[in-house]
Amino acid sequence: MTMATQTAPHYESAVREMSQAAAEAEQTHAPIRLAYWRIAAMDTLLDRLEELRLAGERTLPEDIRELVVAYAERHDRELADRIQRIDAEDLNAVHDAVFDAQGRVMLELAELRRVPNWQDLDLTLAPGDDEAA
C-alpha cells in the first residue's frame, strides 16, 4: 500500500507534464489547422465562382453570395469589409476578393509554419538573377 501512495505523486506529476505539453502543442498546431481549413473553404468558394465565370455568368447568384458573406463574417473580417465596399453581385469582383483573401491566408500559414512564401522568393530572385521568372 505504501508503494502505491509513493508512486501516485510521480504519476500525477507525469500526467500534469504530459497535459501541459499537449496544451502547448495544441496552441502551436491549432492556428495551422485553422489556416488549412480556411484555405480549403476558400478553394470551395473559388471553384463555385470559377464555374460560373466559365459559364459566362457575370452576376453572382444570391445563394453563393450568401455563402461568401457568411464565410467572411465568421472567419475573415478583412474579406467581409472588402465585400461591403464592392458590388457584391459582381462575380469577378467577388472572385478577386476571395482569391486575394486566400493569398493572405497562405502568407499567414507560411509564417505560422516558418517556411518561405512567394513574396520571400520574389525578393530572393530579384530582376537580373538568372533564375528570376
Annotated model-derived regions:
Residues Q20, A40-L54, E66-V69, E73, ...:
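Extended, non-membrane alpha-helical segments enriched in charged/polar residues
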Residues A23-Y36, L54-P61, A80-H95, W118:
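Charged, low-complexity interaction regions
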Residues I83-A133:
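Amphipathic alpha-helical binding modules
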